[in-house]
Amino acid sequence: SIIGIKILLSRYFLGLLFQITILFTIYTIILLMFGVKDAVVIAFLCALLNLIPYIGPLIGIILMSFLTMTSYLGEDFSSVIIPKTAYVIIGYVIAQLIDNFLSQPYIFSNSIKSHPLEIFIVVLSSGILFGIVGMILAIPLYTVMKVFLKVFFSNNALVKKLTKNI
């Protein structure tokens, strides 16, 4: 069972790394397209913030917007700063849509062998019960719990259904 946990958690963390890489690439392209200073650093920070479920992307869009505006200090506010910031925000939203509807469900369902709805329910309920820390730890702990249940309660019908792909 320890080996099963190790394998699934390794796959989960590789999936997170892949997700961060995808977002980092998209964010970097967006920021470089609009000439934002320190685009790579901003993209990296916002991609890392995306690891915090639901709240991280909100913090990321605020950070990216603010740093985009400060990148154009000295420029005309209405003709340069507002339009460039708006384009960056649109790009950020598109990147989030790609992440939330394409890459994240595919990566997580393949890495930890769970349905995307199952992952959503686990993260949401953990967030309600334990806050942000619960949301961050939800998937790794759920993965450990699934392996534990499969090893010790493999005859239970519900456990069989939840762990059939492990």
Question: What residues fall within each predicted segment?
Answer:
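Intrinsically disordered, low-complexity Ser/Thr- and acidic-rich flexible linkers and loops
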Residues: G74-V80
